[in-house]
Structure formats: C-alpha cells, structure tokens
C-alpha cells in the first residue's frame, strides 16, 4: 500500500513498505530538467545535480561521500528531460542517515566558487565523452529535429557553450527557483516503519522555505519529415529514426510498448531478426518508446559499418512500412505484451525500483501508481489498441532521421534509402 502525505511547506511524500526487504531506497525528486531551461540555461539542471554533491554549510564533498560509504550505502542521482532524482539505497537500519544527508544536499548546498570551477571541467568532460559516442550523437540529433523548437528537443547535458557561460551565482539562483517545495517529491520504498518515516520526513525536509515557482510549459512536436547528418570519424554509422509517441500512463503509451517490442524490443522482434539474425548487418538494433508528461516519441535505431548503412536504413524503413500497411500478427502481439509485462515485473524486484516508480509518477503525473496498477494497465492492452496506434506512430510524414559517423559521401544514398 502506498502512503502519501504533504508536509507543512508543501513537499509531497510518498512511501511503500516492502515487508520482506532488508534495505530501503529513498529519493528526492525535483521538477528540474532540460524542459525547465531557457536556451541560456541549457544544461543547468544537470550541472545543479553535480553541484549538490559538492558540499553544504556543514558537510564537505568528502564528508558526504564518507558518511554514505560508512553505512554501506549508495548515493547517486540522475537528470532527465523532465526532472532530477537524488537517491540513497541503504540497509534498512540506516534510513535516518540517508534522509539526513539527502535533505542537507538538497536544501543547504553551498555552491562554492572553487568547487564550481572544478566541477565545470567535469561536466565539460561528460559533454565531450557524449560527443564521442555516435549513438548518443545520433539519438540527441534525432530528438532535436523531431521536437524542433520545443524544449523536449534540448540535450540534458547542455552544450559546451552554454555550460561554459554559467557562473556559480547564476546556477545557485537557478537551484533556488527550481528546488522549491511545490516542485519536490520525497519517495521511499523498502523496510521501514511508516509512522517513523513520516516524522523523519517532516524533520528532515520540513524546513525548506516556500518560494515562488516557475511553471513548465507543455510540450508538443511540430510535425514534419526531416533528416540530419553529423560527421564523426568512427568505425560505424549510427542510425536513429524518431517518430510520434504518446504521453506517459495513457492507454496509447502502453499499446506503443507492445508495438515497440514487436518492432525491435526483443530477440524475436522484426528488426532484430531481419537485420541481425538473417543478414548479420548489425550488432546493435532496436526500438524504444520515450513518453513524457504531455507527449512522447518513438525511436528505432541501429549501428553498422558505413558500407552497409544505406542497406540497413532501407531495411528499417521497409519493415516499418510493412507494419504500417499490414499490422502485426496476433503472435507478435502476445509476445510483445508478455515481454512488456515480464520486463516490468523483473525491473520491480528491488526497493529502488519501487521508489522510482512511485516517485516519478507522483512528480510528473501528480498521483502515484503501484506495481499492481501498472500491470493492470498492461493487461488491458488489446490488439485493436495496438492497430490503432500504428498509423499515428509509423506515419512517414512525421519521421525524422539522424545519422552520425562517416556519412559525408553517403548522404544521397541514405536519403534514397529513406525515400526522401
């Protein structure tokens, strides 16, 4: 059972007790992602994530690391397009310490200028690393041209230029605007006493000051058919198609999960069989739905030698056209549905997974979904629902494609393979 309450300052707290667990996972979620940023602030949410580990008024960065290591815990964070999560996974008896450390870094970070200057170099290196990975470059570019002009198309890391222009004081002001009680959720799952945790949450997070918050605008994709080529001196060309998807937790988003499994989400999927198993043209090939709060996208991707890039592109496009014309078989539907269900069950085997599920849905959906509720949504998907989303998702008029690698001489051939 999920318990929920709102602290006096407005922070929402959601928790789920798992009686058989020996550990506990606690997370703090903030409505702070790339969709929260202006062009000048691009990368600020991710940089803020880094800086909150760099010391508070009472703890140095080394103190934070040592305290968590001394209790055998794992302290980490991630930034996505719509939010940031800081979490600690610890043995159950150390929940108090985990909450104390998390609340301190979230509410009392110092943004020391010297730490900021050092960490800016770290963030720059992360951007450079991503720029060296053709799969990252291709996926980011496909997302950018698909959501052309919309904040969902912005990279979470930002750019070298935007990060280089940031100052410690400017980033601190961004943190103060985004990390306000109405934008925060605390989620906890594992073995703990619910009443004790309620008191602990109030004690650790109840002091956060109430400040005005900036709204996050709804997202949408403009539609249209676009292609982009990014030259990289790599052994492979990485190919990404980006197409329309659906908002999180909608019936259509669950139908798309099933369709994605049939297209490229498992070993028996169309693209895996046609491109890898039957022809040996690629090692990496797959598909992935990417839902957000108000809209979504769907990606199909592969990596292959430059001499085979056009053939792989043609095969990808041909399979998608065939599914658009003829749909998927009942056997593909049943396999795809059971794969979605089974993958979710396996993913939910840890307290951390439960913490993420209830925390993310509380932050973005303004309500909490249990494992059972999500499984019920999956079980309700019908083949008719999958057939209904196919013409929306696989509409060639809204297909965007990005290629990263040695693509200079092959641009015309790749365009022809796409039918562009």
Over which residues does each language-model region extend?
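His/Glu-based metal-binding/catalytic segments typifying zinc-dependent metallopeptidases
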Residues: 18, 27-29, 213-269
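A glycine- and charged-residue-rich anion-binding loop/surface
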Residues: 3, 15, 209-211, 220-223, ...
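N- or domain-start disorder-to-order transition segments that initiate the globular core
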Residues: 1-23
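Active-/binding-site microenvironments in catalytic and ligand-binding cores
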Residues: 24, 192, 220
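Charge-rich, well-structured scaffold segments of protease-associated domains
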Residues: 6, 61-213, 229, 234, ...
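M16/MPP (pitrilysin/insulinase) zinc-metallopeptidase core fold and M16-derived inactive scaffolds
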Residues: 20, 25-89, 262-281, 292
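Short alpha-helix boundary/capping segments
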Residues: 36-43, 247-259, 263, 267, ...
């Amino acid at each position: 059972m999920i318990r929920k309450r709102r602290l006096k300052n407005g922070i929402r707290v959601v928790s789920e007790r798992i009686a058989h667990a020996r550990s506990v996972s606690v997370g703090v979620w903030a409505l702070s992602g790339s969709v929260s940023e202006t062009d000048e602030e691009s990368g600020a949410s991710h940089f803020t994530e880094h800086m909150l580990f760099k010391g508070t008024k009472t703890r140095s960065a080394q103190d934070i690391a040592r305290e968590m290591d001394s209790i055998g815990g794992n302290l980490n964070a991630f930034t996505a397009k719509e939010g940031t999560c800081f979490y600690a996974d610890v043995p159950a008896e150390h929940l108090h310490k985990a909450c104390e450390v998390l609340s301190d870094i979230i509410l009392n970070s110092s943004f020391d200028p010297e730490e900021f200057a050092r960490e800016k170099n770290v963030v720059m290196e992360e951007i450079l690393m991503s720029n060296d990975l053709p799969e990252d470059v291709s996926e980011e570019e496909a997302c950018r041209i698909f959501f052309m002009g919309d904040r969902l198309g912005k990279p979470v890391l930002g750019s070298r230029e935007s990060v280089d222009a940031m100052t410690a004081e400017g980033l601190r002001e961004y943190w103060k605007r985004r990390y306000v009680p109405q934008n925060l959720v605390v989620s906890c799952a594992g073995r703990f006493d619910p009443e004790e945790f309620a008191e602990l949450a109030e004690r650790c997070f109840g002091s956060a000051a109430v400040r005005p918050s900036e709204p996050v605008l709804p997202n949408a994709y403009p539609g249209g058919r676009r292609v982009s080529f990014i030259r990289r001196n790599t052994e492979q060309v990485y190919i990404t198609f980006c197409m329309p998807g659906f908002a999180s937790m909608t019936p259509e988003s669950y139908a798309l999960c099933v369709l994605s499994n049939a297209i490229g989400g498992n070993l028996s999927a169309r693209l895996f069989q046609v491109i890898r198993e039957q022809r040996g043209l690629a090692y990496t090939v797959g598909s992935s739905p990417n839902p957000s709060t108000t809209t979504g996208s769907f990606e199909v991707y592969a990596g292959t030698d430059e001499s085979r890039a056009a053939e792989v592109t043609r095969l990808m496009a041909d399979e998608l056209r065939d599914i658009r014309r003829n749909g998927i078989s009942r056997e593909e539907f049943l396999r795809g549905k059971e794969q979605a269900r089974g993958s979710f069950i396996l993913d939910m085997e840890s307290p951390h997974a439960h913490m993420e599920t209830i925390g993310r849905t509380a932050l973005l959906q303004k309500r909490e979904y249990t494992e059972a509720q999500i499984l019920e949504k999956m079980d309700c998907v019908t083949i008719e629902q999958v057939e209904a989303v196919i013409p929306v998702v696989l509409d060639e008029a809204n297909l965007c494609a990005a290629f990263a690698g040695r693509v200079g001489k092959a641009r015309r051939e790749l365009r022809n393979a796409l039918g562009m």
